[in-house]
Structures are given as C-alpha cells and as structure tokens.
Amino acid sequence: MVKAASGYRTSGNAGHRYSTPRHRKKQSAPAWLRHLVVLVVYAGAGVWATWPRFTWLVDGKLPATADVSGFVWNMWWLSHHLGHPGSPFFTSDMAAPTGIHLGFSTLMPLAGWMMAPITLACGPSASFAALTLITPGLLCYVMYRAARLWLNEPGAIVAGAFFGLSSMLLWQDWYHVNIATGSIFLPVTIEAAVRFRRRPHARPAVALGLSIGASVLINQESAVVAAIIATVILVPWLIWGLFTDRALLRQVGTPLMIGAGTGIVVASPELIGAIQAIAAGAAVPPRGVLAANYTQFGVPLPTLFAPSPRLSYLGLGRLASAYSYDNRYEKLEGLPTFGVVLSGMAVLGVASSWRKRSTWAFVALWLVSAALALGTSLTFGNCQISSWRSPGTYWGRTCHQYLPLMAHSYSTRVFVPAGPPAGVWKPVVVSNLMPYTWLVRVPGLAGLREADRFAIAGLIGTAMLAGTAVQWLSKRKWTTPLIVVVIGLGVLEAGWSGAARTSPGYHGVMPTALPRLDHFLSSDHSASIVVDFPYGLRGGVGATGSEFSPAAMLIATQDGHPRAVSYTSWISKVAIAGVAKHAFFRYLYEAERGVILSATDVSRARADLQTIRVGWVLMWRNVWTMHKPRWRYAYIDKYLTAVAFRHVKSACLAAGPLSGCHWNKRVWLYRYEPGAPKKAWREPVPVGSYHQRGQK
C-alpha cells in the first residue's frame, strides 16, 4: 500500500485521499468547548420545544396514557432490580402470580440504568420526565455531529435542529420515549460507519459496535434500522474493495470483528432476554394480528409532506388542518410528517448540490424511508386509517386507497356495523408493489409492524438536505440573511406541546401519585398481589382482557405490591396460559365480558383465591364509560364480594371531597378477607347486551 502524503489519511485505497488541513486543527483546538456550547444550546431548545413539559416535572404531572405509566414502571423496575440476582428481563411484579417476560418490551434497560441515580433519589416519575427533557437536545447534537462529516458549521447546526426538534420526533418523546431515545443512535451509527469507511481502524469500528449494541438496549426497532443503515453504508464499499483493493479487505477484517464483538457484548443482556422471551412464546403472535397492524400504520402520501399540526398552536389552524390530526378516525400512534418547511429546504438542498454523490445518498435515505412508511398500500387523503377497520364509515369519503398488484395476506377479525358481536374473519389485502409489504416478509423483520416509524429514518436524509441548502446559503453574502428566514419558518413547525384538549389525541393529565390510596397499600408489607380492575394483560401484540387505568402502574411504583395486570409490547403465551390456570382470573375475564357466572364458577374462584397471594383489588370506575357501565361495575362488585373481598375505601380521582365526586371519577379499594362469611350467589339479571369490542 502506498504511503499517504503528508496532511492526508487513507482508507486502504492509496488513490482515495481525504484532506486534513493543519490550519483547521489550530482553529478548532478548543473543540470540546464548541461542542459543549452547541449541546447546551440544543438542550435549551429542546426544553422550549416541549414546553410545558418542564413545568410538569415540578407539578408532578404526566400524560395520562398507558405507555407513559409503563415507562415509569420500567424505570422503577430497573433501579429496583439493581444489586439483586436474576434477570431484569423477567418480572413477577406484573402479570402476578405467573410473571411475564420483558425481552420484547419497551424496557429500555440502558436508559433505566443510566437514570437510576435520579430514580433512587427523586422517584421514577421524575426520572422519566428528566429523560424526556434531555432527549431532544441529544437528538439535535448527534445529528449535528453526523452532519459535520459533510456540512459546514451553519449547515450542520440547522440540520441538527431540524432533526431533533421536529414534531415527528418530539411527539414520540411525549408519548413513546423509547422511540425518541432509540432514534439517537441512528445518526450515531451513520457517523461511526462513515468514519470507518474513511479511516478503517479499530476505533470507529468499536464506536459502530457500541452504537448498535446500545440501540438494542433502548429500542429493538431502532436497532434493526440502525443495522440496516450500517449495512447499506459498508457492504457496497466492501464489495467494491473485493474487486479493486484486496489490501483494504485484509485491513478492515480485524476491526470489523472487534466492532461486531463489541456490539454483541453490549447488547448481550437484551439478546439473552429476547431468547428467553422467544422460548416463552412471546415472539409468535397471531399472524392475523400482525397483518392487520401492517395496514393500520401506513401513512397516506400527502400526510408525509403536510404541514405540522404544531401550526395550530400558533393560530394557523387552517394550515395545520391539512394533516387532519384532529380527525376522530385517526390512528394516533405518531406524527409522521416531515413538514412543509423541511421538505422545501430539502428540495432546495438537492437543487444546490445535485452534483455531489453524498446529496443523492441523502435523497435515497429520504425517499426509500418515505416509501417504506407508506405501508402496504398507496393512500391519498387526510386520514391515517385502514379500510378493514371502519368500512363504510369514513373511508372513501376523504381517503382513497390503491392496491396495485393486490394480494391477500393472513385473515384477521373484522367488526362491521350490524355484524356479529364476535366479528367476522376476512383476509387482509396488501399491495405487492409497496416495499414495506416485502420487508416484513424477510425472516426476523416481521415484528416491524408500524410502517410509519420508518419516516424517522427518512427525517435524517431530509435534515441533511436542508443543512446542505443552508450551507449553500451561507457561502454567499447576499443569501446569508436568508438563513434567519429559514430558521424562523422552521420554528413554526418545530416542537410538540401535547395534544390540545379538543383533539381526539388528548388523553388528559394524571398525577404522579395518589396519596389517598397509596397509604393504604403502602402500610401493608405483606407483598400481596394487587388486582386492578378493569383487568387485562395489555400492551401491543397478544393483549388480553380490557384496557385498565394508566394510573395503576404509577401507584405500583409507590407501594411496591406486585400487580396482576401487565403492560408490555409483546405478551407471552406462557403468561396468558399461566393466568388462565387460575379460576379467579379466568372467571374475572368472563365477568368482564358480561358473561353471567354460575354459583359453581364463583365457588371455584373463591377456592382458587386461597392458593394465591391476592390481597387487594382496585376498581377504577373511570375507565368504562360506555355500554351500561354502572351495571357492569355493579356486576363485578357482586363477583368480588362473593369471593371474599370487602369494599373498604373509596377515593376521588378529581379534586374535591368524596361526597361531591361523580361515580365515574372514583376508585374503590377492596381487601381480601378469606374469613368473611360466604354469601349466596344469585345470578344477576343482564340489562340488555353490549358489544364485546367496546369495553371502554
């Protein structure tokens, strides 16, 4: 190999040189200070872009969603498990008494371990809130670092802001912090892979392995995307070297092995937990459920480039309505839009730098990710729903779905107006022309069930192109002032402050503690199981039972009692079967569905309770609001009383005295008293019927 000339470095190919001017080193001597200033500015911008989230940290409030309470519980569990033997990827504190595997859940072990000091000092709710506050700044900073590989300082700074402060990512930061935090490692992976291509030594290879391994410990979906990006960056380069530079292949072999080994070692806790979950059946969901998810989360083409709903907070509701975020049929699992400003700047970036090879790499990342985000069909309109979910209700009025090269996937259960209460089984239709249809058929990738999240990877390419446009503007005196205009327009679409109260996406706010109930349960040190009702093993794939109150998992972190409910991304068959073995839970499921129990059923449930350590039941009377909720709650109260529970406490979820509290704003606390005299079971008279699907 020819020795590189002074002032240059090689990548194993003597004819390919990268300049490293010595004067640049002198100018950037205090590089750490510049990076620190950039990071601090980004952190402040992140707090502004998510306002009023910072005030909620002081006020002790959180978004009232099951996902958020699940993240808080995860923080508590990981800090609680530190110093204890056993795997953190299995817990008996959820789905008790059986327990449940967490290998395919949103556990975020790396974030939980890093935030453990705050969790132990201030509590898991404060730790979770702090994580959501620092994530936007980190997203901006890692994007800035990656952009500096190609762009000048102004272009890289703007690219970092467009990425980390986008509504798309900050929506995830509010409600799915695992997605936002996992996205940190996408630009890190790009930076490490490109640095390895430019200088194929052990240091960038180790950085690449650390990035992908750490991503596995945060969010497995992001890790898969990061691995795909690294493969696309490195494999074509290695194949080209196979024919043009064999010495390069000999040079990169050892560093790549070191990097791969580093990634495996870092990710090994999660990988072991995933293997255990696979053995428990957590990775074998019903095919029909996945097929339905594939169609649910595809993004209509206009939505990807629509104005951000953030504009509605600035009085620009007419512009924001193009996205139709407030449509009551919207599947609110994300905010997959690049925005008008960012899309326009990306086009300008292509026009200004179309001769550069890197520009077309960014274009490919943007457009390929956008094509994957479309899902299994090509849809035009201002909604994000699937034709099988609401046939004849909304679809076809403002949304039009096209299925070129249509094919049938697995069958799923469909609920149609005036149809059977149990639904009917119909095949899910997909388009074989869409790339996402083929991606999920690749072995090991079937779990990527939410197509809209691929737009996050496309956001990297879009931000890079926007930064390229800013770089072009910064090189000309007469266009430099336009950068201020670009920043001003970008601010209009940046950030997310939570859904408005009038939006279907508004879930309300919940306090981080309920002292009126906590002291009852905390004073009981028996470690008995608490059953929250409505009851179910909920979350993502394989969920059973009914949705339960988000506050249930929050107060579990206060009293330390195991919970019979669970909230995980994938529910294992072992957990479902283990719960079904217990007559108490089996008949609780049936009573929850409105099935009239017999005296024999109640006797079996009462006998089963004596074999498990259930001590309390919390009846959240604010969850069911439809289909004769008072009769249904009264029926469950009758069942609990018959199996030896006694109502001992009522608390109001709203501010004010209990006497003025509405019935569906209350929580009833029951205590198990096995010595209580038996009550004869009389089958209640059902008051009409209700649709089994509409339990909330």
Regions found by a protein language model. Give the residues of each.
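Transmembrane signal-anchor helices characteristic of membrane glycosylation enzymes that use polyprenol
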Residues: 34-66, 73, 77, 259-278, ...
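Active-site lumenal/periplasmic loops and adjacent helix-entry segments of GT-C-fold
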Residues: 53-150, 155-185, 314-330, 398-399, ...
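Membrane-embedded helix bundles of polyisoprenyl
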Residues: 42-48, 131-149, 154-241, 255-271, ...
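Periplasmic/ER-lumenal interhelical loops and adjacent helix-loop junctions
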Residues: 65-81, 252, 265-350, 384-443, ...
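Hydrophobic alpha-helical membrane-interfacial segments at the cytosolic entry of transmembrane helices
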Residues: 34-43, 210, 234, 247-272, ...
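Start-transfer (signal-anchor) and selected internal transmembrane alpha helices
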Residues: 1-51, 253-261, 351-366, 481-486, ...
